[in-house]
């Protein structure tokens, strides 16, 4: 590759996309600076010179955020970026998924792809720039990569598809789709949608693929100009004679073991065959490398046999038909003190989801590169080791758990009621208790049940299902509700979530070169049938959201005040609002438009806090009459509390009809007296009169007597 700086440009969705090579990170195998609008991402690709002694392809993809990209200094004491944000982890997965299938089988050199976000223009996606940059860094390098690939985001406004929508357009769009692939086929889809029909989603995917073809042609021009010659690598291969011997020893027994229906019994049967073959070679005292090859051949036999059974004999490992869903079972309300809970079981996959309702002050604060500052709906996914009968250290969530949590969040968000209709923060936690495939979709179903149990007025219930594909030449079989073995050994993992009306989320990963439109269309329609079956089951357990919230959930009341009065409610240094909170035990959240949310488990305390706030913001009007309490007495008059937080002065001359020598002769502290507002001066001080009311009363009496005499 030339070491001189070279620049290549193309128009992308009305904004200029520029690629710079030969200036930055020249010691990497491949490096490009992608400029899209004012977004700038440096993408690099490096590889080890020798293959690693592992039985998998060691690829690492990192999407690194830098807060200087949006002119921010990190918070906290250390003042530097720490662990990756959730958004950065999701972006890393987004880039990893389309490039991973495009490395040759048997390639074991360690490869690292790093994209550093250096400048962010919110209207020009840094994730799409990083995906393009990652593909191009690999393509121009000497690393053997069977790309390039490209990605595009697709939105839809008023029925019209848009490529790479701006922030403003995204707010109006009912589809948020990321599609990636090669020039020939799609190999990755990630989407959220507002109950959009399957046919529309398919059209959006195809629309995005047309833009991908254009971006790949652009990359091919750059590779032609600056690309390096690919390095010679030795792909890992097993010994042909050894493979023949192992197959003769294991194939027949493996065929029988694979068809054991129950997961653990099947695993035990397969392991028994494996252990018998490995023991045979251990007795011969062969080298560790040979034993490693034996294990790989056995894995290959299992994979081939599972795929042959599905495509040729139309038999699934657990005996189901291709479109058959495992037995379903669900319950709600199984945890008495939580706000809502739902248990969803599909075969040997089980998820327990818990819904917690909080005040709006419980929103998640986001401090990243995006425009979003907070989040009032969250879905978290946990996958403990006991769910698959294993032991391993209990650590924080990994990339997979964060990805599955985000998928569930995206699937459910379109049906969450607006803040105006339901002023709560909603947090869902899905605990995977058993796993045999499709746990992310089970968590979506469990979360829907939990929210309905909690009384969240969902726009519609959501269910999810995972589809699979096994393709051999021109023959293929689409599988509904894939289990773990079918996911691991198949060619596609296609997750579809939605309501009866349409799709709310899609996630597709392909292990082969890509998929045609026909297969995608068939998979979407088969998924719809499965989704409707699951929805019918869920609605038989709980037909609609509960009318009442849990007694343990906070009750929220909403009121509106004059925005100019917000400072009065808060008080100097928060003194006033903290006093209300201390007195009532409620939570108070105030919006800039004057909307006030008061929340507490105790509704009486909510009402008490509301009354205090109403008194604070209440406007005193000249001419109004109040029954007030004498709070303080001075020589010149008495201070009377009209309502909470508002006092006025009755001057000594306004206390009585006759001349008053001493204030205490008329009123004492604690007395309740009727007063009339006669003036509010320029400083906001309220002047009151008791004398005016006494005079009015006297005049009424005189008028009454005169009327009687007549």
UniProtKB/Swiss-Prot annotation:
It holds the Pfam family KH_1. GO terms for molecular function: 3'-5'-RNA exonuclease activity; magnesium ion binding; polyribonucleotide nucleotidyltransferase activity; RNA binding. It is an enzyme of class 2 (transferase). PROSITE patterns: KH_TYPE_1, S1. Keywords: Cytoplasm, Magnesium, Metal-binding, Nucleotidyltransferase, RNA-binding, Transferase. Residues 623-691 form the S1 motif domain. It comes from the Bacteria. Mg(2+) binds at residues 487, 493. SUPFAM superfamilies: Eukaryotic type KH-domain (KH-domain type I), Nucleic acid-binding proteins, Ribonuclease PH domain 2-like, Ribosomal protein S5 domain 2-like. It catalyses: RNA(n+1) + phosphate = RNA(n) + a ribonucleoside 5'-diphosphate. Its main location: cytoplasm. One of its GO terms (cellular component) is cytosol. Its EC number is 2.7.7.8. GO terms for biological process: mRNA catabolic process; RNA processing. Its cofactor is Mg(2+). Residues 554-613 form the KH domain. Involved in mRNA degradation. Catalyzes the phosphorolysis of single-stranded polyribonucleotides processively in the 3'- to 5'-direction. Belongs to the polyribonucleotide nucleotidyltransferase family. HAMAP family: PNPase. This is Polyribonucleotide nucleotidyltransferase. It comes from Bacillus cytotoxicus (strain DSM 22905 / CIP 110041 / 391-98 / NVH 391-98).
